[in-house]
């Protein structure tokens, strides 16, 4: 009887040791976000739009600065001829205009940063949705992002789906 129980226990031990433990492997990938923004047609168009807008606004401001420099040069020529009271008044006016030009430049930069930031934030939000939908469709458990600063220090190139996402976002942008 003891031998039967011992043999039965030994058989159960063998059977339990023979079972393989199920391990679920996760399907993962990563996207180089810097590359995504560099190669995205929409991101390039946004960048170009704000370069052009900056150039137009800068040209307007530059014309004002040129006028101010011309007045400042005339001021220096005429200061001795027109007297000290005139020079003080005109100097104060020129200083005030210089400060106004400085404020205008700061305001222009702030406006451009705010507008471009809003558009880029909207772009990033839409890209996150596209990536999420792509991940669900392809059965990914995790999709990581890397770029500057790098959050992934190493991954096999086979896990890089940046090209796939760039193609999707560019195709979607072309269709709109």
Give each language-model segment a name.
Residues 122-126, 156, 160-161:
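Charged, alpha-helix-enriched surfaces in structured cytosolic catalytic cores
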Residues 13-16:
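C-terminal motif of bacterial Sec signal peptides marking the signal peptidase cleavage site
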Residues 151-155:
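A structural signal for short loop-to-beta-strand junctions that line the ligand-binding cleft
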Residues 1-4:
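Positively charged n-region of N-terminal signal peptides that target proteins for export
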Residues 6-9:
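Sec-dependent N-terminal signal peptides
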Residues 21-138, 142-150, 174-176:
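Amphipathic alpha-helical segments
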